[in-house]
Amino acid sequence: WIMGHMVNPFEQVDEFLNLGANAIEFDIDFDENGIAKYTHHGIPCDCGRLCTKSAVFTEYLDYVRQVTSPGDPKFRKELVLLALDLKLQRISSEKAYAAGVDVATKLLDHYWKRGWNGGRAYILLNIPLVEDYEFIKGFKDTLRKEGHEQYNAKVGINFTGNEDLDEIRKVLEKLGEDEHIWQADGITSCFARGTDRLEKALEKRDTPGYKYISKVYAWTLVRSSIMRRSLRLGVDGVMSNNPDRVVKVLKEKEFANKFRLATYADNPWEKFTPI
């Protein structure tokens, strides 16, 4: 999975897909009551990027629904995963449950259309800190109460704050979640980061019987050398401001026979098993 980073305005969706992304990450800004208002990152953000571009969240969902709905004039078959970077660290943890309710409701109304010609992409809920775990409860409770638990099959969970992997596992156990789990590791592109935690996450992913990590990705990579380093370690995905650089690296002799771009036929919740 090549995840385009910080794809917040409409016009950047096609821009990043044209550069080779098959997934996009966008930021969700909440008001003080946990209501999702805008796709917006804000200052500071990655070096070389404009931090302030935004869209109304519901309008953005309407747009990406079209991009991920076969038969729609805007349809792009390559876009198979939407990563929602939930800016919960900007609001009180007491509002995390309400935020989960609101995001689930807006996905039902504007993306899935409650079963009427909704978008098909997989959804990854990127939660910054384990203290915000109530978001997941609010989200799942809403799908159940609204009679649309079938969408759980499309939804995955990812804690993105580089916290202790065992602490993340404990929270997932507490929630009763042991599938559809991604693990991110990374830092803003402005800084360098070692691979210790990334390697630990990959080791857990590859441990037989370990349920709490099915995919691992590195973020936010802009240098080809760091992309190569991550691929050599065996990541499932890369988040980048420059998807075209990732595509170019994947075509190199070292990687061309080991990796390919994920398609809609690839289940993002299953561990990859080499043939």
UniProtKB/Swiss-Prot annotation:
Its cofactor is Mg(2+). Keywords: Cytolysis, Dermonecrotic toxin, Disulfide bond, Hemolysis, Lipid degradation, Lipid metabolism, Lyase, Magnesium, Metal-binding, Secreted, Toxin. InterPro entries: PLC-like_Pdiesterase_TIM-brl. It is found in: Secreted. GO terms for biological process: killing of cells of another organism; lipid catabolic process. Disulfide bonds join C45-C51, C47-C190. GO terms for molecular function: lyase activity; metal ion binding; phosphoric diester hydrolase activity; toxin activity. Expressed by the venom gland. GO terms for cellular component: extracellular region. Mg(2+) binds at E25, D27, D85. It comes from the Eukaryota. Its EC number is 4.6.1.-. The keyword Zinc-finger does not apply. Binds 1 Mg(2+) ion per subunit. Belongs to the arthropod phospholipase D family. Class II subfamily. This is Dermonecrotic toxin SpaSicTox-betaIIA1.
